Design a protein with these regions (language model features):
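Short helices/loops that flank or line small-molecule/ion binding pockets
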Residues: 58-66, 80-134, 307-312, 319, ...
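Ligand-binding "clamshell"
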Residues: 124, 129-132, 148-186, 211, ...
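Ser/Thr-rich, Proline-interspersed low-complexity disordered segments
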Residues: 32-36, 103, 112-116, 120, ...
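An extracytoplasmic/periplasmic, membrane-proximal ligand-sensing/linker region
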Residues: 41, 51-52, 187, 211, ...
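Periplasmic-binding protein-like
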Residues: 135-140
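Bilobed "Venus flytrap"/periplasmic-binding protein-like clamshell domains
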Residues: 40-77, 82-83, 257-329, 380, ...
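N-terminal secretory signal peptides and thylakoid transit peptides that target proteins
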Residues: 2-19
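Bacterial signal peptide processing site
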Residues: 25-28
Length: 426
């Protein structure tokens, strides 16, 4: 047992945590062990490079072990496409493992179509399904995931659905040795041109049907490519998860997300805020000095990235450093190498360093929610265990979990996970 673990365990028992422990006096009944869980084999949970994903993955793992599963944790880094493809990769398990699941296995054709339909991360090479180690659960952020699935918000859920249907039909036909006719070229009609961007994605997909579209689904998929983009800034976390559930590839399901309130925020130090009277993103354009920004790669491109500051606040960031590690971004901010950085609102570094969250009246920053995506054949007892954890991960619990597992003297992730499961806030 390490010295840091002992130190933080002593802290857990101190008077500083007395209010929390009192609030947690009432415990949920321990979940029942699933006697068939061991027959599933090793259940593998993938998590990204962010600290909160790592911490939550350990809580899910502890909960799954308590109901009888053997669990392995796998860091997937910053590659969303690789993580989701791992959920679709062949697991090597027998179709019937003895564990109860109400959802049937997808066909090989469906799995292939879903695998190939997923976008590839920028700069990443395409990976064959047999070259990916399979995963059973992946943790992601809802806003970022929806941007990924809709091509940075350019496609409506209706458009994505039609493309997935077309890909699945084409793959099934190819597996059966049938070649479908090519999709006819869609010429804009006067009504299409007149409607412009005023129609919904669903409406534009049916506004000008062709006689061939029912026979060849790729025609309707091609037509809905022109569907209106979605406005993620106007979406609640519930809207986002509903949209994600609708457009996830065949073979994947979305479980309940953590109930914590969380979003992307741009922050600065109190010194910079005072120096430039900067408390809101509106005030960025009034700062006459060049402000340095530290942002992750994912925020560097697209209409929902740093470009949104120009479109919504008439401010262009000219000195931008890309750093994917939030801890590195905080260090750059506090040593004044940069003056503004992007964090998640639950990041304990905001309070620890007394950082100023810049107000965002035009909603440039997206709502975010930690969500588990699963292989469709995940047994019901595993689904229930994950959903129970998500229901307890409100803002207070998630923030407290991150406080325990980060900073200069963090405790072990497994110890923090065990504490959160044994003492959830009520």
């Amino acid at each position: 047992m390490t010295h840091r673990t002992l130190t933080r365990r002593a802290l857990l028992g101190s008077a500083a945590l007395a209010p929390l422990l009192v609030a947690c006096a009432t415990h949920d009944a321990m979940p029942q062990v699933d006697p068939s869980a061991p027959t599933y084999g090793t259940l593998r949970i993938g998590y990204g490079a962010l600290r909160e994903m790592h911490a939550v993955a350990h809580v899910y793992a502890q909960a799954l072990r308590r109901v009888g599963y053997t669990v392995e944790l796998v860091e997937t880094g910053h590659s969303r496409s690789l993580a989701l493809r791992a959920l679709l990769a062949p697991s090597g398990r027998q179709e019937s493992t003895g564990t109860e699941s109400t959802t049937p296995e997808v066909s090989e054709a469906e799995a292939t179509a879903a695998y190939e339909a997923l976008p590839v991360d920028r700069g990443a090479a395409s990976v064959e399904a047999q070259d990916v180690d399979p995963l059973d659960i992946v943790i992601d952020y809802s806003g970022d995931l929806l941007l990924y699935l809709t091509d940075d918000g350019k496609l409506s859920p209706a458009a994505v659905q039609n493309e997935r249907v077309a890909a699945s039909v084409t793959a099934s036909a190819a597996a059966a040795g049938v070649t479908l006719p090519p999709a006819p070229t869609q010429s804009p009609t006067p009504s299409d041109t007149a409607s412009g961007s005023g129609e919904t994605g669903e409406a534009s997909g049916t506004a000008s049907p062709s006689a061939d579209s029912s026979a060849n689904p790729t025609a309707s998929a091609s037509a809905t490519r022109s569907a209106d983009p979605i406005n993620l800034r106007a979406m609640t976390t519930t809207d986002m998860t509903n949209a994600i559930s609708r457009i996830l590839p065949e073979g994947l399901n979305l479980l309940n997300g953590a109930s914590a309130t969380n979003k992307d925020v741009l922050v600065t130090t109190r010194a910079v805020s005072a120096r430039y009277k900067l408390t809101s993103l509106v005030g960025l354009r009034d700062v006459r000095s060049t402000l340095g920004f530290s942002i992750p790669d994912s925020y560097s491109v697209g209409t929902y990235g740093i470009e949104s500051l120009r479109s919504l606040y008439r401010f262009t960031a000219r000195a931008v450093t890309q750093q994917n590690d939030p801890a590195e971004r905080v260090r750059a901010l506090t040593d004044d190498s940069v003056q503004v950085t992007l964090l998640h609102s639950v990041n304990p570094a905001i309070d620890d360093n007394r950082l100023v969250v810049l107000e965002d009246p035009s909603s440039a920053m997206l709502q975010q929610q930690l969500v588990p995506i699963i292989r469709r054949t995940l047994p019901d007892s595993a689904r229930n265990a994950v959903n129970r954890v998500s229901s307890t991960l409100d803002t207070g619990n998630l923030s407290f979990l991150l406080q325990l597992t980060s900073g200069s003297n963090p405790i072990a992730d497994d110890d923090a996970a065990q504490f959160i499961l044994d003492h959830p806030r009520k």
